């Protein structure tokens, strides 16, 4: 059992949903990113999604696009991202880290070198936004050889054939994009999310996390009543963007602690062990 599977197994036994934050590696700088990762774990997160900065992040809204731009101004490379994970691993061996990004930097490095370096750094999963599951058999094979979980996105418009394909390939968890469009959008329909999760669970037997559009404690709690994990990105990245350097860790920590409390306050009747 790897770190991701271990975390979800423990949470299931406790009837708790996972809290998964997203931050961009190198925003505002590499040293602060590692400090942020540790502050997030202190605030109660269960897994960290670490974005690989990219010049054309097509699935991301303006907030996360700007975070990529800030990181790229510091010339943050894929090698730097691995170094941040390795630095984090020096003192944290338990919190899973999932890299989230786009295909170009991976293909420039090559599948084999990427997964070997990721494995040595302590990466637990990789989500590549623009890899169609129908075309990544070789990619998934390389990941699994290093015991790295391939994470996939599903959306409200994903056809049944692709859902079945993701069910075959995915390991660790599946990330359900709860809105059409880009990250940070609003107008989340919680009833629609619940219906879709019920449908997805007829195909998928690993945990399902829900992200995109979760911006406050009430929505996080409601999602936690239905999903195995709550993924929050844009709201946290906004806090990073607008916080003075001296207050950044404290502000992000306070935000995440409030989200953790909200998620743990989910209704008792909505057991993830019953799903």
UniProtKB/Swiss-Prot annotation:
PROSITE patterns, per the entry: TRP_SYNTHASE_ALPHA
InterPro entries per record: Aldolase_TIM (IPR013785), RibuloseP-bd_barrel (IPR011060), Trp_synthase_alpha_AS (IPR018204), Trp_synthase_suA (IPR002028)
Superkingdom of this protein's organism: Bacteria
Pathway(s) the chain acts in: Amino-acid biosynthesis; L-tryptophan biosynthesis; L-tryptophan from chorismate: step 5/5
Quaternary structure, from the entry: Tetramer of two alpha and two beta chains.
Enzyme class: lyase
Family the entry assigns: Belongs to the TrpA family.
Entry keywords, A to Z: Amino-acid biosynthesis, Aromatic amino acid biosynthesis, Lyase, Tryptophan biosynthesis
Catalytic activity: (1S,2R)-1-C-(indol-3-yl)glycerol 3-phosphate + L-serine = D-glyceraldehyde 3-phosphate + L-tryptophan + H2O
Organism whose genome encodes this protein: Nitrosomonas europaea (strain ATCC 19718 / CIP 103999 / KCTC 2705 / NBRC 14298)
GO MF annotation: an example: tryptophan synthase activity
Gene3D superfamilies recorded: Aldolase class I (3.20.20.70)
Gene responsible for this protein: trpA
Function: The alpha subunit is responsible for the aldol cleavage of indoleglycerol phosphate to indole and glyceraldehyde 3-phosphate.
Name of protein: Tryptophan synthase alpha chain
EC number: 4.2.1.20
Cellular compartments per GO CC: cytosol
Catalytic residues identified in the record: 49, 60
Pfam families: Trp_syntA
Signal peptide segment: none
Coiled-coil features, chain-numbered ranges: none
Segments passing through the bilayer: none
């Amino acid at each position: 059992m790897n770190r991701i599977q271990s975390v979800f197994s423990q949470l299931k036994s406790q009837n708790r949903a996972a809290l998964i934050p997203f931050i961009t590696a190198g925003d505002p700088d590499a040293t602060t990113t590692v400090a942020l990762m540790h502050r997030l774990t202190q605030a109660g997160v269960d897994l960290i999604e670490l974005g690989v900065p990219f010049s054309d992040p097509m699935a991301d809204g303006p907030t996360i696009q700007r975070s990529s731009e800030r990181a790229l101004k510091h010339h943050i490379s894929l090698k730097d991202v691995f170094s941040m994970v390795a630095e984090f691993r020096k003192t944290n061996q338990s919190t899973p880290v999932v890299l989230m990004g786009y295909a170009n930097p991976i293909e420039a490095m090559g599948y084999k070198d990427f997964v070997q370096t990721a494995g040595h750094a302590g990466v637990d999963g990789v989500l590549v936004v623009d890899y169609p599951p129908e075309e990544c058999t070789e990619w998934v094979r390389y990941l699994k050889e290093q015991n790295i979980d391939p994470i996939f996105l599903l959306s409200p418009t994903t056809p049944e054939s692709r859902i079945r394909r993701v069910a075959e390939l995915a390991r660790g968890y599946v990330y359900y994009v709860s809105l059409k469009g880009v990250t940070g959008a609003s107008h989340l329909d919680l009833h629609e999310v619940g219906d879709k999760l019920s449908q997805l669970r007829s195909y998928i037997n690993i945990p399902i996390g829900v992200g995109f559009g979760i911006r406050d404690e009430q929505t996080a709690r409601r999602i936690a009543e239905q999903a195995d994990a709550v993924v929050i990105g844009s709201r946290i990245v906004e806090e990073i963007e607008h916080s003075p350097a001296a207050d950044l860790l404290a502000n992000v920590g306070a935000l995440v602690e409030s989200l953790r409390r909200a998620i743990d306050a989910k209704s008792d009747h909505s057991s993830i062990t019953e799903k």
